[in-house]
Amino acid sequence: MSASAATGVFVLSLSAIPVTYVFNHLAAQHDSWTIVGVAALILFLVALLARVLVKRKPPRDPLFYVYAVFGFTSVVNLIIGLEQDGIIDGFMTHYLREGEPYLNTAYGHMICYWDGSAHYLMYLVMVAAIAWEETYRTIGLYWVGSIIMSVVVFVPGNIVGKYGTRICPAFFLSIPYTCLPVWAGFRIYNQPSENYNYPSKVIQEAQAKDLLRRPFDLMLVVCLLLATGFCLFRGLIALDCPSELCRLYTQFQEPYLKDPAAYPKIQMLAYMFYSVPYFVTALYGLVVPGCSWMPDITLIHAGGLAQAQFSHIGASLHARTAYVYRVPEEAKILFLALNIAYGVLPQLLAYRCIYKPEFFIKTKAEEKVE
C-alpha cells in the first residue's frame, strides 16, 4: 500500500459533510426504518469505496476498512457536536430529533466530541500505519479501551435512562459499533508486541530494586490505593448507599451522579467493576517483577479512563445538564482536581509501563521455566 491510500481515507471521511446534509433533508420525509436502512447503506458504501481505494494493492490488515468506516462516523459525530452547539445548522437536526434523541444529552454531546476528535485522530494514525506497513499495536490498544468504555456506558445508559422509552430503530446502528471494536481488539492484541532489546544486566538491576527504591512507582502505588477508594466510594453512591457521607458528597460535590439520564450511574459502576480490579492487578504488577502483561492492560485501561473522564467531567459541567444536577460553583475546584487527577493517573502509569518497561520484562530464565 502507499501513502495515497491513507490520504484517500482522510478525504473519504470528509465526504460525511455533504452526505449528512443531504441525508438530513431526505430523513425528514421518511419513516424511522427507512432512515436506518439508508444509514446502513451509506456505511456499506463507505467500506466499498475504501476497498476501491486500495484495489491495486489491498492491505493485509482487514481492520483498514473498519477504521475507514469509523473515521467517517467520527466526522458525523463531530458534525453532531457542532450542530448541538449552534455552530452549524441543517446537517443532523432531524436525525437528532427522531433517530437518536439521547445524543442531545450532555453525555451524548461529550462523546460526540470525543469520537470526532480523539478517536478520529487515532483512526487516521492507524490507517497511515497500515498503509506504511508499520505496527500500531500501542495506539490500537489505547483506542480499544477508549471505544469499549464509551459503548459500555452509552448503550446501557440509552436503555435504562430516561430515554429508555424512546428507543428508536436507529438504536440498532449501535450493534456494529459494539461488535467490531471487540473483534478489532482481539486482532490488535494478537499482533506481535514490541521487542525490547535491553541487556540482561539492565533488566536484572531494575528488577532487583524493591518498591522503596523506586520513588515514582511508590507514588503510583499510593495513588492507585487512593483511586481504588475513590472508585468504590462513587460506586456505592451509584448503588444508592444511604450513608450520610454519600448523601453529602452527592448533594454538595457531584449531584450529576443522580442524573436520571443514568449515564453517570453506569459510569461509576463501570469504574467499580472494571477499574477497581485493574487497580488491584496493577498494584501487583508494580510490586512483583516480570509481569509482562502490565503494558497491555495499562494501555487499554488508560484509553478507557481518558474517554470516560473527558465525558464525565464535561457532562457534569455542561449547560445541557439540568441545573440541579450540575456541579455547584463553589465545588468546581475540588471536583476538577479530583476528577482530573483520577483521569491523569492511568496515563502516567501507561507512560511508565511503555517507556520504562525493564521492570516488567520477563527474564530468559522465567521464559524457560514457562
From Swiss-Prot:
One matching Pfam family: EBP
Topology class, membrane: Multi-pass membrane protein
Compartments reported by the entry: Lysosome membrane
Tissue: Enhanced expression in spleen, testis and peripheral blood leukocytes.
Record field: transmembrane: 3-23, 34-54, 62-82, 110-130, 139-159, 166-186, 218-238, 268-288, 331-351
Keywords: Lysosome, Membrane, Repeat, Transmembrane, Transmembrane helix
Ranges for domain EXPERA: 60-185, 216-350
Cellular component aspect of the GO annotation: lysosomal membrane
Primary location class: membrane
InterPro entries xrefs: EXPERA, TM6SF1-like
Name the UniProt record assigns to this protein: Transmembrane 6 superfamily member 1
Source species: Homo sapiens (Human)
